[in-house]
Amino acid sequence: MSEFALHGHDLFGEVVKPKASGPVAERFTLPPFTILDARSGEWQERKRAWLSMGFRSEVGRLENSLGMSDAASLGEKDTSIFDPVAVELAVRWFSPVGGQVVDPFAGGSVRGIVAGCLGRQYWGCDLRAEQVAANEVQSEDIAPAVRPVWICGDSMETLADAPAADFVFSCPPYGDLERYSDDPRDLSAMDWHAFVAAYKRIILRAVGKMKPDTFACFVVGDFRDGKG
Protein backbone atom coordinates (compact mmCIF):
# COMPACT_ATOMS: atom_id res chain seq x y z
CA MET A 1 0.00 0.00 0.00
CA SER A 2 1.35 3.45 -0.94
CA GLU A 3 2.14 5.95 1.80
CA PHE A 4 -0.95 7.73 3.09
CA ALA A 5 -0.86 11.47 2.30
CA LEU A 6 -2.72 13.22 5.10
CA HIS A 7 -1.66 16.65 3.82
CA GLY A 8 -1.88 15.78 0.14
CA HIS A 9 0.82 15.86 -2.55
CA ASP A 10 3.02 18.62 -3.93
CA LEU A 11 3.36 19.64 -7.59
CA PHE A 12 5.78 16.78 -8.16
CA GLY A 13 3.47 14.17 -6.69
CA GLU A 14 5.47 13.78 -3.50
CA VAL A 15 3.72 13.35 -0.16
CA VAL A 16 3.56 16.65 1.75
CA LYS A 17 5.01 16.25 5.24
CA PRO A 18 4.94 19.17 7.70
CA LYS A 19 8.33 19.87 9.20
CA ALA A 20 8.77 17.85 12.39
CA SER A 21 9.78 19.63 15.59
CA GLY A 22 12.71 17.26 16.06
CA PRO A 23 14.04 13.75 15.33
CA VAL A 24 11.78 12.13 17.91
CA ALA A 25 8.68 13.77 16.46
CA GLU A 26 9.85 12.88 12.97
CA ARG A 27 10.00 9.21 13.91
CA PHE A 28 6.81 9.07 15.97
CA THR A 29 4.67 11.74 14.22
CA LEU A 30 4.30 13.58 17.55
CA PRO A 31 6.54 13.27 20.64
CA PRO A 32 5.64 10.01 22.46
CA PHE A 33 5.45 11.42 25.96
CA THR A 34 3.44 9.95 28.82
CA ILE A 35 1.09 12.93 28.61
CA LEU A 36 -0.01 13.99 25.13
CA ASP A 37 -1.03 17.59 24.52
CA ALA A 38 -4.08 17.58 22.25
CA ARG A 39 -4.13 21.39 22.39
CA SER A 40 -0.71 21.82 20.78
CA GLY A 41 -0.42 23.43 17.37
CA GLU A 42 0.97 20.27 15.77
CA TRP A 43 -1.87 18.15 17.13
CA GLN A 44 -4.53 20.61 16.05
CA GLU A 45 -3.00 20.90 12.58
CA ARG A 46 -3.17 17.14 12.10
CA LYS A 47 -6.68 17.02 13.52
CA ARG A 48 -7.88 19.65 11.06
CA ALA A 49 -6.29 17.70 8.21
CA TRP A 50 -8.06 14.50 9.24
CA LEU A 51 -11.41 16.19 9.79
CA SER A 52 -11.18 17.90 6.40
CA MET A 53 -11.64 14.44 4.87
CA GLY A 54 -15.29 14.67 5.89
CA PHE A 55 -15.67 12.59 9.06
CA ARG A 56 -19.19 12.67 10.47
CA SER A 57 -18.79 10.14 13.24
CA GLU A 58 -21.94 11.35 14.98
CA VAL A 59 -24.05 10.08 12.05
CA GLY A 60 -25.80 6.87 13.01
CA ARG A 61 -25.71 7.66 16.71
CA LEU A 62 -28.65 8.80 18.75
CA GLU A 63 -28.93 12.57 18.64
CA ASN A 64 -27.71 14.19 21.84
CA SER A 65 -26.51 10.92 23.36
CA LEU A 66 -24.81 12.82 26.17
CA GLY A 67 -28.18 14.40 26.92
CA MET A 68 -29.61 10.95 27.64
CA SER A 69 -27.24 10.50 30.54
CA ASP A 70 -26.38 12.17 33.83
CA ALA A 71 -23.78 14.23 31.94
CA ALA A 72 -26.63 16.43 30.73
CA SER A 73 -26.63 18.11 34.11
CA LEU A 74 -23.11 19.33 33.33
CA GLY A 75 -24.31 21.09 30.21
CA GLU A 76 -22.61 18.60 27.89
CA LYS A 77 -25.30 18.19 25.25
CA ASP A 78 -23.47 16.95 22.19
CA THR A 79 -22.49 13.49 20.99
CA SER A 80 -18.77 12.89 21.51
CA ILE A 81 -16.51 12.42 18.48
CA PHE A 82 -13.31 10.39 18.66
CA ASP A 83 -10.13 12.37 17.98
CA PRO A 84 -8.55 11.05 14.74
CA VAL A 85 -5.05 12.07 15.87
CA ALA A 86 -5.37 9.83 18.93
CA VAL A 87 -6.25 7.00 16.56
CA GLU A 88 -3.33 7.81 14.28
CA LEU A 89 -0.79 7.79 17.09
CA ALA A 90 -2.08 4.62 18.73
CA VAL A 91 -2.21 2.75 15.44
CA ARG A 92 1.22 3.95 14.27
CA TRP A 93 2.92 3.30 17.61
CA PHE A 94 1.39 -0.03 18.59
CA SER A 95 0.57 -1.96 15.41
CA PRO A 96 2.47 -3.06 12.31
CA VAL A 97 1.59 -1.91 8.81
CA GLY A 98 -0.75 -4.54 7.40
CA GLY A 99 -1.69 -5.66 10.91
CA GLN A 100 -5.16 -6.44 12.22
CA VAL A 101 -6.95 -4.02 14.56
CA VAL A 102 -9.85 -5.44 16.61
CA ASP A 103 -12.31 -2.98 18.18
CA PRO A 104 -15.04 -4.52 20.40
CA PHE A 105 -16.78 -1.16 21.05
CA ALA A 106 -16.68 0.37 17.57
CA GLY A 107 -19.13 3.26 17.78
CA GLY A 108 -18.51 5.79 14.99
CA SER A 109 -16.41 5.57 11.86
CA VAL A 110 -13.19 7.33 12.91
CA ARG A 111 -11.11 4.43 14.27
CA GLY A 112 -11.96 2.15 11.36
CA ILE A 113 -11.29 4.68 8.61
CA VAL A 114 -8.08 6.08 10.12
CA ALA A 115 -6.72 2.58 10.75
CA GLY A 116 -7.52 1.63 7.16
CA CYS A 117 -5.90 4.76 5.75
CA LEU A 118 -2.74 3.85 7.68
CA GLY A 119 -2.58 0.43 6.05
CA ARG A 120 -4.14 -1.69 8.81
CA GLN A 121 -7.01 -4.14 8.61
CA TYR A 122 -9.87 -3.23 10.92
CA TRP A 123 -12.64 -5.28 12.52
CA GLY A 124 -15.13 -3.47 14.74
CA CYS A 125 -18.39 -4.47 16.39
CA ASP A 126 -21.35 -2.29 17.34
CA LEU A 127 -24.80 -3.18 18.67
CA ARG A 128 -26.69 -0.74 16.45
CA ALA A 129 -27.39 -1.59 12.80
CA GLU A 130 -27.90 2.12 12.09
CA GLN A 131 -24.38 2.86 13.28
CA VAL A 132 -22.80 0.10 11.21
CA ALA A 133 -24.66 1.24 8.08
CA ALA A 134 -23.63 4.88 8.64
CA ASN A 135 -19.99 3.86 9.12
CA GLU A 136 -19.98 1.89 5.89
CA VAL A 137 -21.42 4.83 3.95
CA GLN A 138 -18.82 7.20 5.39
CA SER A 139 -15.97 4.81 4.63
CA GLU A 140 -17.08 4.61 1.01
CA ASP A 141 -17.37 8.41 0.78
CA ILE A 142 -14.11 9.28 2.54
CA ALA A 143 -11.72 6.49 1.59
CA PRO A 144 -13.26 4.07 -0.93
CA ALA A 145 -10.01 2.13 -1.27
CA VAL A 146 -10.09 1.34 2.45
CA ARG A 147 -12.18 -1.60 3.60
CA PRO A 148 -12.83 -1.55 7.36
CA VAL A 149 -15.15 -4.30 8.54
CA TRP A 150 -17.97 -3.41 10.93
CA ILE A 151 -20.10 -6.16 12.44
CA CYS A 152 -23.52 -5.56 13.96
CA GLY A 153 -24.00 -7.54 17.15
CA ASP A 154 -23.00 -8.04 20.76
CA SER A 155 -19.23 -8.29 21.23
CA MET A 156 -19.87 -10.83 23.95
CA GLU A 157 -20.85 -13.16 21.10
CA THR A 158 -19.21 -11.81 17.93
CA LEU A 159 -15.64 -11.74 19.26
CA ALA A 160 -15.54 -15.51 18.97
CA ASP A 161 -15.41 -15.05 15.19
CA ALA A 162 -13.19 -11.97 15.14
CA PRO A 163 -9.79 -12.23 13.44
CA ALA A 164 -6.61 -12.66 15.47
CA ALA A 165 -5.46 -9.21 16.57
CA ASP A 166 -2.15 -7.42 16.18
CA PHE A 167 -3.72 -4.57 18.16
CA VAL A 168 -6.88 -4.41 20.27
CA PHE A 169 -7.99 -0.78 20.24
CA SER A 170 -11.31 0.49 21.54
CA CYS A 171 -13.22 3.17 23.40
CA PRO A 172 -15.75 1.54 25.76
CA PRO A 173 -18.73 3.34 27.29
CA TYR A 174 -17.85 5.33 30.42
CA GLY A 175 -20.44 3.95 32.81
CA ASP A 176 -23.62 5.93 32.19
CA LEU A 177 -21.78 9.11 31.18
CA GLU A 178 -22.95 8.75 27.59
CA ARG A 179 -26.03 6.70 26.65
CA TYR A 180 -26.02 5.10 23.20
CA SER A 181 -29.28 3.14 23.15
CA ASP A 182 -31.94 1.48 25.28
CA ASP A 183 -30.84 -1.99 24.19
CA PRO A 184 -30.51 -4.08 27.38
CA ARG A 185 -27.23 -5.47 25.99
CA ASP A 186 -25.79 -1.96 25.74
CA LEU A 187 -23.26 -1.40 28.53
CA SER A 188 -24.23 2.28 28.75
CA ALA A 189 -27.81 1.27 29.64
CA MET A 190 -26.78 -1.06 32.51
CA ASP A 191 -26.54 -0.35 36.20
CA TRP A 192 -23.04 -0.18 37.62
CA HIS A 193 -22.62 -3.79 38.74
CA ALA A 194 -23.98 -5.24 35.48
CA PHE A 195 -21.80 -2.78 33.54
CA VAL A 196 -18.61 -3.86 35.29
CA ALA A 197 -19.36 -7.57 34.85
CA ALA A 198 -20.16 -7.25 31.13
CA TYR A 199 -17.23 -4.87 30.57
CA LYS A 200 -14.78 -7.37 32.06
CA ARG A 201 -16.16 -10.28 30.04
CA ILE A 202 -15.95 -8.41 26.73
CA ILE A 203 -12.42 -7.17 27.37
CA LEU A 204 -11.36 -10.68 28.39
CA ARG A 205 -12.71 -12.03 25.10
CA ALA A 206 -11.01 -9.25 23.13
CA VAL A 207 -7.66 -9.82 24.81
CA GLY A 208 -8.08 -13.52 24.05
CA LYS A 209 -7.91 -12.66 20.33
CA MET A 210 -4.46 -11.07 20.64
CA LYS A 211 -1.45 -12.59 18.91
CA PRO A 212 1.73 -13.04 20.97
CA ASP A 213 3.75 -9.88 21.67
CA THR A 214 1.01 -7.45 20.70
CA PHE A 215 -0.66 -4.50 22.40
CA ALA A 216 -4.08 -3.45 23.64
CA CYS A 217 -5.25 0.13 24.15
CA PHE A 218 -8.56 1.19 25.73
CA VAL A 219 -9.36 4.90 25.66
CA VAL A 220 -11.49 6.02 28.60
CA GLY A 221 -12.56 9.34 30.06
CA ASP A 222 -12.91 10.59 33.61
CA PHE A 223 -15.91 8.98 35.28
CA ARG A 224 -17.22 9.06 38.84
CA ASP A 225 -20.39 7.79 40.43
CA GLY A 226 -22.92 10.05 42.11
CA LYS A 227 -20.90 10.00 45.33
CA GLY A 228 -17.77 11.37 43.61
What is each stretch, according to the model?
Residues 1-228:
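Class I S-adenosyl-L-methionine-dependent methyltransferase catalytic core
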